[in-house]
Regions:
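RNA-contacting regions in translation and RNA-metabolism proteins
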Residues: 1-147
Length: 147
């Protein structure tokens, strides 16, 4: 709370232990999820979640320094990440159907690593398409390819 409380007077922080990133892997880290809730917090999200990703990076770095070990922390603001994940999964399924029908690959816009991962996971069992990340740095994007 102290770490994030300075950001807004009316913000509350809800903390919970999340599900492991890879439920099939018993050694996968279990994240600490912090959801900052309150009015007028869009500035914490920023354009396409860039400010939120930066905030999460800073919090992880501060906690790692304090605790002298890495801590898997996921920060969300008014459930932005949950909503964005749902949007990405719906978009992935919609574009996968277009790729399957047309038989031609389609590249998505450049995305952050966690968003690309969401696309890969959403389509990993799709019978008609496969995914591949292409490009470098902040220009890296997912291409959906017919099988």
């Amino acid at each position: 709370k102290d770490l994030l409380g300075f950001l807004s007077d009316d913000a509350t922080v809800v903390a919970r232990i999340g599900a492991p990133d890879e439920p099939d892997d018993p050694g996968a880290p279990t994240p600490l999820e912090l959801d900052v809730q309150g009015g007028d917090l869009g500035f914490l999200i920023g354009h396409r979640g860039e400010a939120l990703s930066s905030l999460q990076y800073l919090v992880r770095a501060l906690l790692a320094k304090q605790l002298k070990r890495n801590v898997h922390v996921v920060i969300d603001v008014d459930s932005y990440r949950v909503k964005r994940r749902e949007q990405l999964m719906a978009m992935a399924r919609r574009i996968a159907e277009q790729v399957a029908q047309r038989g031609k690959p389609m590249s998505l816009e450049p995305m952050a690593p966690d968003e690309r991962r969401t696309i890969h996971i959403a389509l990993r069992d799709h019978p008609a398409v496969r995914t591949e990340s292409v490009g470098e740095g902040n220009r890296r994007k997912v291409t959906i390819i017919p099988r």
